[in-house]
Amino acid sequence: MKQLHLEPIACIDGEINIPGSKSISNRALLLATLAKGTTTLTNLLDSDDIRYMLASLEQLGVQFELSDDKTRCTVQGMGGAVSASTAQTLFLGNAGTAMRPLCAALTLGQGEFTLTGEPRMEERPIGDLVDALRQLGASVTYLKNDGFPPLTINATGLNGGDVDIAGDLSSQFLTALLMVAPLAKGKVNINIKGELVSKPYIDITLALMAQFGVDVQNHDYARFEINPGQQYLSPGKVLVEGDASSASYFLAAGAIAGGSVKVTGVGRLSIQGDVKFADALEKMGADIEWGDDFIIARSAKLSGIDMDMNHIPDAAMTIATAALFAEGETCLRNIYNWRIKETDRLHAMATELRKVGAVVEEGHDFIRITPPVKMNTAAIDTYNDHRMAMCFSLLAFADCGITINDPDCTSKTFPSYFAEFARLTQEA
């Protein structure tokens, strides 16, 4: 197994333009496919999740041109549903942002589609989405375990109707349903059961759908109405914002050991909820400066916080490791959906924090962290989870350094992460 040892680092300083958002990249690729007209996406993320989506679209006959650096993609829209005359099997790795939306989108046309992935994908639930699609007339069959991939879709189009979907597990289910609803044969009313997690991710979906000319009536996130007869129309160009979750590691580094760190590509005008990570850092005591398309973090004395993190579950992981550099206890609440991500992140985070000496209480949907008086060095397991690797890179600011096992797992969202981290710390 490959390991990366990070020697103790005293300071970080500089500026970084954050690669495109994974969430926006894959949503925009799918909407551009369903749209009428040609769409050029710029600042597209080049990472594993996006490559799985592009490979699947290519296999389905979607025509696109990708620049040499893979960050600019021009998509010839299909002007509606994707169909296939022969049975298709699509391999989607561990890319939830490809699996969930494609599962929904492929019910719209005609044909037989089988969706498979890595072993971890077979442990990531999709049952709530499939149940909702079945309520609208879709034929979906599980190939192994009920409620989980792999699965086969026998597509004949989606009817309209009323559909109930649980809101408390993953916002990706609702995102997938929202994106296909305008192309159903009749009006779709989506009713949310329970509290909706990760609302800001739904805002991203609604903003992009509006950019492609589709209207959704949002009744306070409890009910969504989507009228039939709508068509996605290419806006011509779509700029993919920098990934706000990826920005969180550099902002936290600035708060712990700046200097000052300026991230560009996200800011006050961002459609991503994860920019609110900077507010959480500010609550801890960090010096934060906002611009329309940048955020600057400077170091200050940090204190522990007790906070509901339901609105920023991905970026909240970064607070868990930043908490090691704060005075007092930190408690992150309402984060159950960490458990169904790339790995069970609640268990993984608790396990690895204990290795460096933290006292950790792992609850059903919360984590409570008391930093150690003196941190231990350790070899951190990353569980094939990009965010675990990036979060624990912050322990390079401890005076003992840190070792990251399987550092290349960052290829899921940020292949050049450790190179950029080294660049800013070297400049310091």
Swiss-Prot record:
Keyword Electron transport carried by entry:
no
Record InterPro entries? Enolpyruvate_Tfrase_dom (IPR001986), Enolpyruvate_Tfrase_sf (IPR036968), EPSP_synthase (IPR006264), EPSP_synthase_CS (IPR023193), RNA3'P_cycl/enolpyr_Trfase_a/b (IPR013792)
What are its GO biological-process terms? amino acid biosynthetic process; aromatic amino acid family biosynthetic process; chorismate biosynthetic process
User: Which residues hold phosphoenolpyruvate?
Assistant: K22, G96, R124, Q172, R345, R387, K412
Q: Which residues form the active site?
A: D314
Please list the residues that bind 3-phosphoshikimate.
Answer: K22, S23, R27, S170, S171, Q172, S198, D314, N337, K341
Enzyme Commission designation: 2.5.1.19
Known role: Catalyzes the transfer of the enolpyruvyl moiety of phosphoenolpyruvate (PEP) to the 5-hydroxyl of shikimate-3-phosphate (S3P) to produce enolpyruvyl shikimate-3-phosphate and inorganic phosphate.
What interactions and quaternary structure are annotated? Monomer.
Q: Could you tell me what this protein is called?
A: 3-phosphoshikimate 1-carboxyvinyltransferase
Please report the organism this UniProt entry assigns to the protein: Shewanella denitrificans (strain OS217 / ATCC BAA-1090 / DSM 15013)
Tell me the name of the encoding gene. Answer: aroA
